[in-house]
């Protein structure tokens, strides 16, 4: 479910937030990617694995037996528990296509990971390359797991305070900012959904208060002033 209580960051606030990360290669890179792709933290870092631990009765359903007689059966829902320290998906160094300016991501849909692609700006590509070289990362290394999942969430709060932002800021603000800025430029929900991996274009309307090649040029042009 998409949260509706996010207080939007203005461009000035987002610029200030980015300025506070200068000198910290990892967080500057992570925030820049999040800001210019609108991707969820789970798609960048990876989603925490879960295991089935049982089922919960949530109601009843009526079915018919072989004689046509109505039978009341329990309607259940699977209960999952997160597995500490284990993640699936997430961007690896080999998922960055420097030649074509694309990045593979794994989107969780109906508990299954589905491969998608997102467009990267020239600045973002250069920043990623700089980080990879400086940290001597290999093809199989996970690009955004140089810090813990929790650590990244806490860092957003810390850097936003240093930037002088008074309202609450979370990692979701980057996705919110990305969508909001594109809508200000007149982008349709359908076009934005192709970039963000939203399940439906209808979900994007909440932000009103495989990459299609036909929008790559438009995307890079729009992101120049992000």
Residue ranges and their predicted role:
Residues 1-15, 111-123, 137-139, 218:
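DNA breakage-rejoining catalytic core of tyrosine-based enzymes
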Residues 1-5, 65, 73, 222-226:
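C-terminal secondary-structure termini that scaffold catalytic or DNA-interacting sites
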Residues 20, 33-34, 181-185, 195:
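Short alpha-helical segment immediately N-terminal to, or the first helix within
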Residues 149, 166-186:
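Short basic/aromatic active-site micro-motif
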Residues 196-221:
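Catalytic-site neighborhood detector that most strongly recognizes the C-terminal catalytic loop/helix
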Residues 121-166:
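Active-site/catalytic core of tyrosine-dependent DNA strand-transfer enzymes
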Residues 46-127:
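Conserved tyrosine-mediated DNA breakage-rejoining catalytic core shared by Y-recombinases
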Residues 2, 7, 11-41, 45:
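Basic, Lys/Arg- and aromatic-enriched nucleic-acid-binding interface segment
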């Amino acid at each position: 479910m998409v949260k509706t209580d996010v207080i939007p960051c203005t461009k000035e606030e987002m610029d200030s937030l980015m300025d506070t990360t200068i000198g910290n290669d990892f967080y500057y890179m992570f925030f820049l990617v999040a800001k210019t792709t609108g991707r969820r933290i789970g798609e960048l870092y990876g989603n925490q694995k879960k295991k089935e631990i049982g089922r919960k009765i949530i109601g009843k359903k009526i079915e018919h037996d072989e004689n046509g007689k109505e039978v009341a059966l329990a309607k259940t829902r699977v209960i999952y528990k997160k597995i500490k320290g284990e993640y699936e998906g997430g961007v690896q160094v080999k998922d960055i296509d420097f030649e074509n300016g694309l990045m593979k991501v794994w989107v969780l849909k109906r508990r299954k990971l589905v491969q998608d692609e997102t467009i990267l700006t020239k600045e973002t590509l250069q920043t990623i390359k700089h980080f990879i070289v400086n940290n001597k990362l290999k093809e199989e290394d996970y690009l955004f797991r140089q810090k813990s999942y929790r650590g990244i969430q806490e860092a957003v709060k810390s850097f936003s305070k240093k930037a002088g932002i008074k309202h609450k800021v979370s990692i979701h603000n980057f996705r919110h900012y990305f969508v909001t800025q594109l809508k200000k430029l007149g982008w349709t929900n359908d076009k934005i959904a192709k970039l963000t991996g939203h399940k439906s274009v209808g979900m994007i309307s909440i932000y009103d208060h495989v990459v299609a090649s036909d929008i790559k040029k438009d995307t890079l042009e729009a992101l120049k002033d992000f």
